[in-house]
């Protein structure tokens, strides 16, 4: 069903659950390393493997960072919260239960204000932020798109099992209408910026450091009661969040219009076409048979400790943006463009690395954003760091690279050929400084274009572009355009 048709009949109600992997050195309940990227099943221990008799010990840093996230989300912090066992059987959960929090979360009743593409603010209310441990990772072999359906075998990697997670759960988002997909994207983006600013997570959606579950239901316009919801699991990019919700709105509306019913189920997002596919029936809280974990005491967070943590909060993203907008004298529209391109933090870091704001903006918003779009990845997942941009800007300023050569250097960085200096050396990109070679190229170009020489001497000085182009082609773009123009003017004087 067409998106506009959906909105004529139905009101979407949305809820977002975002799992944020904390960047602690060790796991939530054991001393095993929590680092990403190790060999499969190398960061494991008796606790994360669920071996008999192994007892959990709470990671104090994980609790501190959970409180920090709660405070930044304007939540109330519970003086006493508890861990609970969430019971279910799945190969990536060695204990057959997950240590989580149920009816006594560490943070609750907060909000996060997000800015939409046209500058409108929307307040997303937070129901809770609770601590839990991550599961292991399954790799399915022989199935479709890596899914379990049709798989001939499944491999289990328990490195991730026990890594600290904070799950941030929104209250139902009502009244969003056509803007529901945009609000979801803006919220996830704002939450990612927040945890990165706090220094508690790298917020990498592409690596699973943040994973989004999107709950959606439709109800006829004017109806108060919620419809049956579906939960699209483990969405791993901002674009995918927007597409998944858009597709689910259209799919559910079509089912309802055809006289069908919506099944309460999980669904899988398909990156290839932006659709969702059927998963499994969705459990209720009762199905998990939660009960307080008898191996873990309550988590006590005295007011004094909470206030000490509050005092350590860094400049938060929205405060930073207001300061930057004033310092750089940006209009509201210019600021929105940077935010909508997910480029602002990268630009700020590039300026901190030594460029001017205009130089940093020119690179991130144009050429590098274009490359990210062509690759279908988020800007910060392209492989270009602020230090790379600062380096090419410096080399252009020093006359060692032209803008064209600088773009080739960035291409090499994206291709994984090394840092900027390594790419310049390997590709031989540095500007030609052989005056004799450049002068010969200019002489050859002038000799090959007598009509342009004649027009120039007749007073049309704008025709030299073709000569400059011929020289740049002859030198494979390595001549300094300013030097070429000076030589042309000198020879035609």
UniProtKB/Swiss-Prot annotation:
Superkingdom as given in the UniProt entry: Bacteria
E.C. designation(s): 6.3.5.-
PROSITE patterns referenced in this protein's UniProt entry, alphabetically: GATB
Chain segments carrying region Disordered: 268-291
SUPFAM superfamilies, A to Z: GatB/YqeY motif (SSF89095), Glutamine synthetase/guanido kinase (SSF55931)
Keyword annotations from UniProtKB, A to Z: ATP-binding, Ligase, Nucleotide-binding, Protein biosynthesis
Gene Ontology MF: a single term: ATP binding
Name listed for the protein in its UniProt record: Aspartyl/glutamyl-tRNA(Asn/Gln) amidotransferase subunit B
Name of the gene this protein is made from: gatB
